[in-house]
Amino acid sequence: MNSSYKSRVFNIISIIMVSMLILSLGAFANNNKAKADSHSKQLEINVKSDKVPQKVKDLAQQQFAGYAKALDKQSNAKTGKYELGEAFKIYKFNGEEDNSYYYPVIKDGKIVYTLTLSPKNKDDLNKSKEDMNYSVKISNFIAKDLDQIKDKNSNITVLTDEKGFYFEEDGKVRLVKATPLPGNVKEKESAKTVSSKLKQELKNTVTPTKVEENEAIQEDQVQYENTLKNFKIREQQFDNSWCAGFSMAALLNATKNTDTYNAHDIMRTLYPEVSEQDLPNCSTFPNQMIEYGKSQGRDIHYQEGVPSYEQVDQLTKDNVGIMILAQSVSQNPNDPHLGHALAVVGNAKINDQEKLIYWNPWDTELSIQDADSSLLHLSFNRDYNWYGSMIGY
């Protein structure tokens, strides 16, 4: 083999290798461009500050996947690859913010849940963000609304008032979740404006929070889950004061394995002389809760405070229903929902930590939160203190 032939072979091989390198670099560049394009279309949520307490970040990362798996199990949904977006905040139109942090939980590319980290107990409300203890809760709160605009290159601010929750984008305000307040008529959204103070504070933020997938932590484990076997959500509370009626109906339907109970019939039984027009304004008092339970063959008793995890576990195994009695921390005397009732559905152990599963009659799905938290951060941005329980339904 002469030297000129060797030289030609070497040149051909060199050309092939250079061509392959160019192609691979091109593919890498295209892949990066695709990723960049994908991220450029990600939803961004405006925040005053992108600083999140480290304990909040750690709790969210440690627990989100286990919570999502547990809630998926309750709705018989298949598990998937769970990822956590970045934290965002919710503001009033005047710029005030609440004391909670919200994370979108993403499964297989879709926002399916919202992870909420809020003060654990009433005493924590007076502590700084860095010093307070946080409770972790998961629900479907505004998750579907966020998912609908996740890939539309949107930049929004999440806002709230007594009417509900809103997305503001390019100066336009859109109601996405109405609160169950009597006479809650949807106002013209165009009339709502964000305060100049909040606009400036949001503008000063270095970067908005991005609703994008982060690397999932897959070792989260749901070691145990125990719920009332026949519990189903059949109705939802709207513009009325029947929270206890809804909760009692749901618990009795579950423990008796029937579908004969509903909130309206229970309230009509308790208030036979009240007109249909005035019935939505009727509330339920503790003695009525006990007497109605007894009329249905149940031995109901009141217990102060939050029942222990072990007690909830045993009562649920025994097919005994527990109703939560809670009071709004704000103590506004004009609040039609100053008191609230919810139904305990069961308990779970996630990553060796004890959790309670409950149903808020305002919601269409269940929620899960820490078993040692007496503070309930409910679906229209208010904190309720769990002060007692009615046991025996």
Swiss-Prot record:
Q: Which residues form a coiled coil?
A: none
Q: Any idea where this protein resides?
A: Secreted
This protein is called Staphopain B
- UniProt keyword list: Hydrolase, Protease, Secreted, Signal, Thiol protease, Virulence, Zymogen
Post-translational modification summary for this protein: Proteolytically cleaved by staphylococcal serine protease (SspA).
Q: Which residues form the propeptide?
A: 37-219
Signal sequence interval, chain numbering: 1-36
For this protein, the activity regulation entry reads: Prematurely activated/folded staphopain B is inhibited by staphostatin B (SspC), which is probably required to protect staphylococcal cytoplasmic proteins from degradation by SspB.
> A GO BP term, please?
proteolysis
Subunit relationships: In the cytoplasm, prematurely activated/folded SspB forms a stable non-covalent complex with SspC.
User: Which gene carries the instructions for this protein?
Assistant: sspB
- Miscellaneous comment text of the record: The cascade of activation of extracellular proteases proceeds from the metalloprotease aureolysin (aur), through SspA to SspB.
Q: Which GO MF terms does the UniProt record name?
A: cysteine-type peptidase activity
A matching Pfam family: Staphopain_pro
What is this protein for, i.e. what is its function?
Cysteine protease that plays an important role in the inhibition of host innate immune response. Degrades host elastin, fibrogen, fibronectin and kininogen. Blocks phagocytosis of opsonised S.aureus by neutrophils and monocytes by inducing their death in a proteolytic activity-dependent manner. Decreases surface expression of the 'don't eat me' signal CD31 on neutrophils. Cleaves host galectin-3/LGALS3, thereby inhibiting the neutrophil-activating ability of the lectin.
Give the chief site where it resides. secreted
Instruction: Give the family, as the similarity comment puts it.
Output: Belongs to the peptidase C47 family.
Residues forming the catalytic site: 243, 340, 360
* InterPro entries, sorted: Cystatin_sf, Papain-like_cys_pep_sf, Pept_his_AS, Peptidase_C47, Staphopain_pro, Staphopain_pro_sf
Task: Kindly state one GO CC term assigned in the UniProt record.
Answer: extracellular region
| Site location (Cleavage) | 219-220
List the EC numbers from the record.
Answer: 3.4.22.-
